[in-house]
Each structure stands twice: as C-alpha cells, then as structure tokens.
C-alpha cells in the first residue's frame, strides 16, 4: 500500500500535460524580447539600406552564392594485380649431400588411362590436375631428427625464373578442390598429411610446402610423399604453357640444406599421350642431329666414296666385249660414250696403272672395224633408203 501511494504522489512527465497547461507556462507579454531583436536590427540598419538602393537603383541585390561543396577527390583505380617478382632464384642443381639424397618414381606406361607417369629420359613428370603424384625419397643413411622436406615450384626458362609460380585466378576462386588447409594460390599440395605447412616467404614471395621427414617403414627402403598439382600448365593467367620445375630439398631443423633434387612437371589432361609425344620428339631430334666425334664424319666420307665404285670395278678387270652396231652415226655415238667412260675411270683411278694402255688398245682395235663393215651396211641401207 505504501508503494502504491508513493507512485500516486509522483508528478506525471511533461509529455502527459495538456496543451493549455503548456500555453499557460509561456509569459503573457514580450514574446520576443528586446534582447533578441537588438542584434537583428544591428545586422542591416535602415539608413544603410536606403543609401545602398540610391547608389545602385538599376541593380538588383545579389545574394552571395552559397559555396558549392568541395567535390570529393576522384577515386583512384585499384592497381592491377601483377605477379610478384623475386630476385632470388633457388638452385636446381642436384646435390645428394652427405646422406645420398635422391628421388624415385613408380614405373608406369603411356596408356591414356594413366593419371600420373614419369619419363626417365626427359626427367619429367606428367600428371592430371589434383591427381595423386607419389614421389619417393631415397637416402643412404638416415638424416638427423627434425629433418624436413620442402617442395617448391619455379619456372624452367631463364626469362621466367623471377616470376612466382602460382595458380590461375579461375582455380584460385574455385571451391572444387579446396581442402581448407592449403592457401588457394599455392600450386603444390601434400595429400593425406595434416602436418604439412604452406609457407609464403616474405623476402622472395615464393610458395612452398614443408612436411617432416619420416623414416621408411620396416618393409620399405624409401619414404613416399603424395603431391598434388592444382593448376593445369595451359591455364591462362597462371603457368600459361610455361614449363616449371619442382625442387625437392632436404633440410635440417634450422633450415640448412642437406640434399636437393628436381624434376620437370607438366599438368595436362592426357599424361600418357603427352609423354609418348615428347619422347618421340626427343628420339627424332637425336637421330636427326647426332653428336659423333668431330673427325668421324670427315673419315666416313672418303670410305663411302671409295666403297661405292667397287661393284663397278669388277667388270673392268681387263675383259673386253664386242658390240655389233648398225649405222655409222650410232657407232660414233657409242664410241664417244665409251671414251668418256674410259676417261672418267682413268681420272677416278678406278683402273690399274695400265688402264690408259688398255683404253688406247681398245680404241685402235675398234676403229678399223667400221671401215670394213661400212660398205656392206651402206649397201643394205641403200634399198631401204630408196
């Protein structure tokens, strides 16, 4: 009861009063006090207005135009995203180190159904997008504890080495192959290893993935890491058909190099077909451009030239043949041809030293023959000509 009486004694707020009550609160006279009107009169006195109108009767008063609000500065366009460049190019030279570090790959053919195949002659791995690529790590002796394995991709050609290898914009934005662990711009991923670390170097801007080195199992002699390549080699805005190298390094816990090896990678739709094509091109190139010793070709030329006329030298062992020819013109034609052949053989040295004597003896033996046969042959041709 006491609380209810206290609530009744509280005056209502101002908003609950009537308009008449509010009106009565205003003063009865001098709604606008002189204190407020005085400053208004000082702003523009009457005498000043009259003088101003007398001086400029034909001009209308011009009010000062309100200053236009300052236009906001034009928005600068966002800078185009350019590929980061790195002045540091990692070495790709093979370095087995003290532990005999080297790489190995599973043997696979060139069938169309393969998703990953390695060519030993090209030292090149052909694989499909986001498919498993097992890479074997071989060592002669176990490395120290805390050893890590780093994988990094660089461009193979010299003019592209300073550019950082990354995925194309389309695959970066795509969520089809997102695992939530690897950054979308990284090209190389490790499959089935939650201890993988994806690093972006602040100085070189290059991407790499690092996993702890694990010793081989009891029934195995090597350690296998399954890599994925998350962008095609032909993607525009990414690799753009530029060949790349994957560098695998063995490092200790402080980052010191223990071993290095590398191989070329091509991410394509049909690895078996591309491997077969490139191996055939390499084979044709090797056949068309052999690399023999510098003097071997010079020695081969005279042996070929001397061996080629040997079959023609056998019938010229001093044996002569007689050919009956009808007509003097035909005889002269064959004689000139025979003399030319004899001269050619003499110049080439295909006959023994007495070849000239034999050729002169042959000419003296064959020349009188047409005189004795000329008359009867002319007599035979006489009736035919008539």
From Swiss-Prot:
Its cofactor is Zn(2+). A motif (Nuclear export signal) lies at residues 332-343. The modification Phosphothreonine is found at residues 18, 277. Residues 94-285 bind DNA. Residues 92-293 are annotated as: Required for interaction with ZNF385A. Coiled coil: none annotated. A motif ([KR]-[STA]-K motif) lies at residues 363-365. There is a cross-link at residues 284-285, 344 (Glycyl lysine isopeptide (Lys-Gly) (interchain with G-Cter in ubiquitin)). The modification N6,N6-dimethyllysine is found at residues 363, 366, 375. The modification Omega-N-methylarginine is found at residue 326. Residues 318-349 are annotated as: Oligomerization. Residues 63-102 are annotated as: Interaction with WWOX. GO terms for molecular function: ATP-dependent DNA/DNA annealing activity; copper ion binding; DNA binding; DNA-binding transcription factor activity, RNA polymerase II-specific; molecular condensate scaffold activity; promoter-specific chromatin binding; RNA polymerase II cis-regulatory region sequence-specific DNA binding. Residues 108-285 are annotated as: Interaction with AXIN1. Residues 358-377 have a biased composition (Basic residues). Forms homodimers and homotetramers. Binds DNA as a homotetramer. Interacts with AXIN1. Probably part of a complex consisting of TP53, HIPK2 and AXIN1. Interacts with histone acetyltransferases EP300 and methyltransferases HRMT1L2 and CARM1, and recruits them to promoters. Interacts (via C-terminus) with TAF1; when TAF1 is part of the TFIID complex. Interacts with ING4; this interaction may be indirect. Found in a complex with CABLES1 and TP73. Interacts with HIPK1, HIPK2, and TP53INP1. Interacts with WWOX. Interacts with USP7 and SYVN1. Interacts with HSP90AB1. Belongs to the p53 family. The N-terminal and C-terminal disordered regions undergo liquid-liquid phase separation (LLPS) following homotetramerization and activation. Post-translational modifications, such as phosphorylation or lactylation affect the ability to undergo LLPS. The nuclear export signal acts as a transcriptional repression domain. The TADI and TADII motifs (residues 17 to 25 and 48 to 56) correspond both to 9aaTAD motifs which are transactivation domains present in a large number of yeast and animal transcription factors. This is Cellular tumor antigen p53. It comes from Bos taurus (Bovine). The lineage of its organism: Eukaryota, Metazoa, Chordata, Craniata, Vertebrata. The gene is TP53.
